[in-house]
Amino acid sequence: MKSVNAVTIKELYDLSHTEAKPLMEQYTYPWEVLPHIGEFIVKLGESLPKEEYTEVAEHVWVHKTAKVFASAYLAGPAIIGAETEVRQCACVRGNALVGKGCVIGNSTELKNVIIFDNVQVPHYNYVGDSILGFKSHMGAGSITSNVKSDKTLVHVKGIDPETNEKFDLETGLKKFGAMLGNHVEVGCNSVLNPGTVIGSNSNVYPLSPVRGFVPAESIYKTGGVIVKKHA
């Protein structure tokens, strides 16, 4: 099947806002990056300037301006960027590249993720096998679901905005949460089902069970209704 531009790295992300730029530039779709995050973090961490970063545990690098609360848990490999806060009881389980100016909040859990600069996951969020774009925000209690109930491989499905035709992309992955573009707002207590891709500048209503592709500049409403912003 031909490429679907709307769900490519080029369309979803501004790579100037992540240290993962050299990794992500190698691939077409963002989910192709997921199996390589851990190895990339280790290589990047070993090259970080020691006057700026402290290796607080094996393969865990924290910028000296970051604030990590005593009750937070950090497992490697992980990098925590400048001016980021990792708040009370947050759990970083490894393979987590967290950018600058982020908020990893109370009881939030991260696993195998790239978190771009200025992202907020501030209250009771689970983000696994996912990539969150620049200035994206997940409301309290919203989570990514990263494994299907039947344990089959995840597909990305939707309607291509360029052709108005349905697409179904195989990912080859059992674990795949969500890809959020730049400036995405996810409402409280929403569930982003496996294989969710949300285009830049889109909003999701609270309590939404999101599945598949949500185009850029859209609003995902109650009942799965998707409308264009300012239409």
Protein language model features and the residues they cover:
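Terminal amphipathic alpha-helical/low-complexity segments used for targeting or macromolecular assembly
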Residues: 1-59, 167-171, 201, 207, ...
